[in-house]
Amino acid sequence: MKNLKINFISLGCPKNLVDTEVLIGKLNQENISFTANPEEADVILINTCGFIEPAKEESIETILEAVKLKQNSNKKIIVTGCLVERYKQELEKEIPEVDYFIDLKNQSQIPVLFDIKPKENTKRIISTPKHTAYLKISEGCDHTCSFCAIPNIRGKHRSKPIEALVEEAKYLANLGVKELNIVSQDTSYYGYDLYGKPMLFELLQHLEKIDGIKWIRLYYLYPSTVDEDFFKFIKGSEKILHYIEMPIQHSEDKILKDMMRGYRKKKLYQILEWKEKYTPDMTIRSSVIVGYPTETEEDFENMKNFIQEAQFDWLGVFVYSHEEGTPAYQKHKDKIPKKEKIRRLNEISALQENITEQKNKSLIGKELDIIIDGFSEEWETLPIGRSYRSAFEIDGAVYVETTEPVNVGDIIKVRIKDTIDKYDVVGEAE
C-alpha cells in the first residue's frame, strides 16, 4: 500500500476523543502519517457526535465540508461515531459521496480498510498536550433519563477492568502525562457490572500510586450515586483534585421525576452540605437543561433561585433537544417555543456569569498551583495555565506573569492578582 496521509477530525465529548486516539494508535503504521490539514490528506476520518441537535448539525456540516474537499480529488472520506450509530441508513442515502459510514460496533475494523490487521494491544496516541490526557473507565449507561439518547447509542454500562485501566494510566504517565482526567458516561457507577458493587474508590487508589501522575480530575458524576463517603474519600486524597463535574440537569422535583433522573432536590442539597463539610474548597461544574416540555415559568424561576443558592463554580446551560427514540420524545410534544427556550438559557447564563465572576474575584491574593498548558497567542512569552478549579479546554484560564522560563506541563506556584474577564484571571509566579 502506498504512503497515506490521514486527517482525523474528532467531534463531541472527551470520551469520543479517546475513541479517536485509539483509532490513531491502530492506524499508526510506517506507511501512514497524520496531518492536521484536511486539504493535504488522502483520507479524512471523522468521528462524529450525535446526541443533541446542535451536535448533529456540527457533524453534518463537518461531513459536508469534507465532501467539498473531495471534489476533483481522490480523497476518501470515512465517517464513524455516534451520528452514524443513530442514522447510518439515512446518511448513506443522503450523503453518498462518503466512502464508508462505520457504526460503533465495527469501529475496531476501520484498520482493515487500510489493509491493517486489527491488534488488541495497540497503544492509543494522545492528541492532547502531553501533560494531560483522558482515561475512559467505562462505556455506555444504565440510566434511562427521559431526554437522553446515549443509552440507545452506546448501550448498557460496561466497566473496564481495574487492571487494564491501571496499565493504560501507567502508559500515559510514561508519556509524560501529569493530569489524568477520568471520563465515562457515569463515573460514580463504575464497577457495578464487573464486580457487583461500586469500585470507583478502589480504582482511584490504584491510580494514585502511579509515579508521574500528579493530578486526578473526575468528570461525569451522577448525583444519585454520589454519597457522603465520596467526599470523605476526596478529602483524604493527595492527588484527586477538589473538582467534580456533576450534571444536575434540573432542580425541581416535578421535572426531575419526569426526566427519570433518580434523585430529587433534597439529594442536591445533601451533596452541597457534604461538600461544605468535607471539602469546602471543592469546585463543582454542573449543567442544566432549560425548556423541558413540562417546565413552567415557576419551575424555571425556582431553578434560577436554586442556582443562585448552590453557587456552582461553572455551569453549562443547554436548551432541551427533542430526540427521537427517547422517553420524553414518546411522551411529550416539544411545546415550548424556541424563542422562549433561548430567553431562559440567556437568563441562567447571565446569572451564572455573575456567580463565576465573583468566585474568580475571591481568588485575588490566593496562591494556587498552576499547570501550564501553553502560551498566549497575543503575547507569546506569557504562559497560560489552570488551577485545580479548571478543566482542560472547558473552564477559565490563568495568565501567568513570570520572569523565569517555564515549560508546558510545569506545575508552579502562582499568586492571583486580578480578573481579566468573567472567566479568566491573571497571577504572578511566586
From Swiss-Prot:
GO terms for cellular component: cytosol. It catalyses: L-aspartate(89)-[ribosomal protein uS12]-hydrogen + (sulfur carrier)-SH + AH2 + 2 S-adenosyl-L-methionine = 3-methylsulfanyl-L-aspartate(89)-[ribosomal protein uS12]-hydrogen + (sulfur carrier)-H + 5'-deoxyadenosine + L-methionine + A + S-adenosyl-L-homocysteine + 2 H(+). One of its GO terms (molecular function) is 4 iron, 4 sulfur cluster binding. Residues 4-119 form the MTTase N-terminal domain. [4Fe-4S] cluster 2 binds at C141, C145, C148. One of its GO terms (biological process) is tRNA modification. Its EC number is 2.8.4.4. Binds 2 [4Fe-4S] clusters. One cluster is coordinated with 3 cysteines and an exchangeable S-adenosyl-L-methionine. Residues 127-358 form the Radical SAM core domain. Residues 361-430 form the TRAM domain. It is an enzyme of class 2 (transferase). Belongs to the methylthiotransferase family. RimO subfamily. This is Ribosomal protein uS12 methylthiotransferase RimO.
